[in-house]
Amino acid sequence: MPEIPVGSQIFDVVFHPSSAIAYTGLLNGHIKAFAYGEQGDSHNLFSLRPSKRSCRGLSLNGDGSKLYAVGKSKALHIVDTTTTDIDARSAAHDCAINRVKSLMPWVVATGDDDGTVKLWDPRKRDSVKTYTQHFDYISDFLWLDDKKQLVATSGDGTLSVMDVRAKEPKVVAQSEDQEDDLLSIVAIKSAQKILVGTQLGILSVFNRKKGWGDCVDRIPGHPLSIDTLCNIPDDIPDTDPTSTVLTGSSDGFVRVVQILPTKFLGVVADHGEFPVERIAVGGGRYWVGSVGHDEVLRMTDLGAFFHENHVDSDEEEDDEEEWGGIEGADGSEGEEDEEGKAVEGSAEKGGGASSDESDDEDEEMEPQLGDQSSKRKRQPEVELPDPSRKSKKGKKETVIDKDFFDGL
């Protein structure tokens, strides 16, 4: 697993849309760019320091020519990725800016620690719209291109939907208080459902057709907060990209989770005792960049992960088919005994596991239990042991106990 040391804690990472380049925003205010190869080798392209204060958020425009950076300095910095020239909007907010997202060629959104959201036209010096519906920090943004709507999640426990086309700052909808910090957001199922990560480790599912008032489902399993969410590329084979996401948690794991039906697919990266701050997916071999407090950009080959996972699942299916064929070879029909029914009943009652690992084990056990109930082999009659015979441990020979006959 390639690691790129950066020398400071990383707050955010983004990948160039068409080139093998990763950009990182650091605690010491630096923005570092790295070019990487197919084997995970890398070299430094440039290092800038627009501000001496931390860089908390990064976003690239559609063609990767402009890099937008925000942080504790309250400024919006626009970096030309080719010339490394910097155009600054000083005092863009009244407090530290936490998130930034490029929405359209000439529309950029920023969100600060007080919950204020602003829209910018990079060609102008001042913001074009300001939204104040939140009272706590903005944690993440999601852009819904079909409706030209911006969704923001906040530490105040709500998410809000803004129509950027409206002449006046207009909030289309705002959810009820979810009684938990909303930390991350991503769209699934062709953007018909929205997945939100929370401080308590719950994945909340919103259905756009049913409105934004409240979530329609809550998926437990992560032991700690879900700080970041990321979609997987559309063209990874043997996966459903519309329902599979990457999650980054405070426990240091980057997980692959399938949603609706919910299934834990595996761990992509492990940051040890350090929490995962951000995840992004680059091109080429589908490198996943994950960052935390360990001062390294960790690169993981997502394509290889899914390939190995698919091979392992194929081998398991082959083993199950071979095992089932041997069991049915004698032509006897299976009979369900009371033990089998009891096992199945206990498996059904144990469906509400509280961790990803236990959910995975339950789902792996279900098909095995089904095979045992439908093709249970008739058990051979067991011959009761003769009390006059005792067997020595470790040997198959039988020894006659003479004392037994003396007592008759």
From Swiss-Prot:
Residues 396-408 have a biased composition (Basic and acidic residues). WD repeats lie at residues 5-44, 50-86, 87-130, 133-172, 177-216, 221-267. The keyword Nucleus applies. The keyword Metal-binding does not apply. GO terms for cellular component: nucleolus. It comes from Coprinopsis cinerea (strain Okayama-7 / 130 / ATCC MYA-4618 / FGSC 9003). SMART domains: WD40 (SM00320). Residues 311-408 are annotated as: Disordered. SUPFAM superfamilies: WD40 repeat-like (SSF50978). Residues 313-339, 356-366 have a biased composition (Acidic residues). Keywords: Nucleus, Repeat, WD repeat. The lineage of its organism: Eukaryota, Fungi, Dikarya, Basidiomycota, Agaricomycotina. Gene3D superfamilies: YVTN repeat-like/Quinoprotein amine dehydrogenase (2.130.10.10). It is found in: Nucleus, Nucleolus. It holds the Pfam family WDR55. This is WD repeat-containing protein JIP5. Belongs to the WD repeat WDR55 family. Transmembrane segments: none annotated.
